[in-house]
């Protein structure tokens, strides 16, 4: 789920934190990728018309997505490192239960749509029933090993592990669609990196330092804002939308002060849920269960693919095209050996500002100009006062 409306807040209040570019612009970079998001994306992109299973009826869409989208990244000079989720924190159990319920409801709706609805209805509800299993993850790990692409298992949250690897300089950034990756202090969040080429979505670089600068916040305030917006650990406070949440943190500075203000309000405009352990949520963001970047498990490297192993697994066991698999292996061998070249940061351009963003920027510029004008007047007044003092006065 990530953080509700966080991208909207950043795009409106810190637009310079977001840069858009093509996948080729990531050339020469090592990137830690949230493997759950990557695996699930392929499922959600699949439709009934695509070949989701082999002749034996086994699901192969997760392997197809992992193989071809990884090839696309390597073709563009990216060195991917996949990070798989471990056990979720206990505080996340509520969100996971909701997801299970939503999938069950979607399954019922999909079955009903098959009887009475359109093909679009069937596809829409079928996508919501996606569930990545341990077997899917195990097969993806086997595939990555044969491809020569490294992966690690996170103790808990994959995005937290991606963030610490980026923070410690082991990789350039963390690739995930979950905005809460920024709450774990990832210096750079890459969105849409693992989308298929057909999606034609630009790769978004979101820089944490620019986010904090644009919002005028320290990291603790930013995390408090994200908790107030609603995250995987806690639901948002009823009736507190993104603009209200932003104003509350700016006005009061901390969640403690926000909670105190809400609870002392005689009108009871907002009501904090009985079970709302925001201190625990904050601690999970600042002290996640992750492997240190210098741990042996994080000493990863990229190797040449096992071509015959790939053929045995993908062709003989899973029914893939041998020509395509061998061609993909050749691309891996060639591109993983490619010498690193200098990067041109000019590849990226700032995201075009919306009318609302332009209006916000104009307002801030006017406020800044007004403050400068006021200060100039005060300085001139002080100077005149000094000049008006009688001679000999001290």
Swiss-Prot record:
The name this protein goes by in its record: Flap endonuclease 1
Region (N-domain): 1-103
Class of the enzyme per the UniProt entry, highest EC level: hydrolase
Keywords for the protein's UniProt record, in alphabetical order: DNA damage, DNA repair, DNA replication, Endonuclease, Exonuclease, Hydrolase, Magnesium, Metal-binding, Mitochondrion, Nuclease, Nucleus, Phosphoprotein
Gene that specifies this protein: FEN1
Co-factor: note: Binds 2 magnesium ions per subunit. They probably participate in the reaction catalyzed by the enzyme. May bind an additional third magnesium ion after substrate binding.
Composition bias type Basic residues, residue spans: 383-394
UniProt region (I-domain), positions on chain: 121-252
């Amino acid at each position: 789920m990530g953080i509700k409306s966080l991208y909207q807040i950043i795009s409106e209040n810190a637009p310079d934190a977001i840069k858009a570019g093509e996948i080729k612009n990531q050339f020469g970079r090592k990137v830690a990728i949230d493997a759950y998001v990557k695996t699930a994306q392929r499922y959600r992109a699949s439709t009934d018309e695509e070949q989701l299973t082999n002749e034996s009826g086994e699901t192969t869409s997760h392997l197809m997505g992992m193989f071809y989208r990884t090839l696309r990244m390597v073709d563009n000079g990216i060195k991917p490192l996949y990070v798989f989720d471990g056990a979720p924190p206990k505080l996340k159990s509520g969100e996971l239960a909701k997801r299970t319920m939503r999938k069950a409801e979607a399954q019922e709706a999909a079955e009903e749509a098959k009887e009475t609805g359109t093909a679009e209805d069937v596809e829409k509800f079928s996508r919501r029933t996606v569930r990545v299993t341990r077997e899917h993850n195990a097969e993806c790990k086997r595939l990555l090993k044969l491809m020569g692409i490294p992966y690690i298992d996170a103790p808990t949250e994959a995005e937290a592990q991606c963030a610490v690897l980026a923070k410690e300089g082991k990789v350039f950034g963390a690739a995930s669609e979950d905005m809460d990756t920024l709450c774990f202090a990832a210096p750079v969040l890459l969105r849409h990196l693992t989308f298929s080429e057909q999606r034609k979505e630009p790769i978004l670089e979101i820089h944490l330092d620019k986010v904090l600068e644009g919002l005028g916040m320290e990291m603790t305030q930013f995390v408090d804002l994200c908790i107030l917006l609603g995250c995987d650990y806690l639901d948002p406070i009823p009736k507190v939308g993104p603009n209200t949440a932003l104003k509350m943190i700016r006005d009061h500075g901390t969640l403690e002060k926000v909670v105190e203000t809400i609870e002392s309000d005689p009108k009871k405009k907002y009501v904090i849920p009985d079970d709302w352990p925001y201190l625990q949520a904050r601690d999970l963001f600042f002290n996640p269960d992750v492997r240190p970047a210098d741990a042996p498990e994080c000493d990863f490297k990229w190797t040449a693919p096992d071509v015959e192993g790939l053929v045995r697994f993908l062709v003989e066991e899973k029914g893939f095209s041998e020509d395509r698999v061998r061609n993909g292996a050749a691309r891996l061998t060639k591109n993983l050996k490619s010498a690193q070249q200098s990067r041109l940061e000019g590849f990226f351009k700032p995201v075009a500002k919306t009318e609302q963003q332009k209006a916000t920027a104009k307002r801030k510029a006017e406020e800044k100009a007004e403050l400068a004008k006021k200060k100039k007047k005060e300085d001139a007044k002080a100077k005149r006062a000094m000049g008006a003092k009688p001679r000999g006065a001290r």
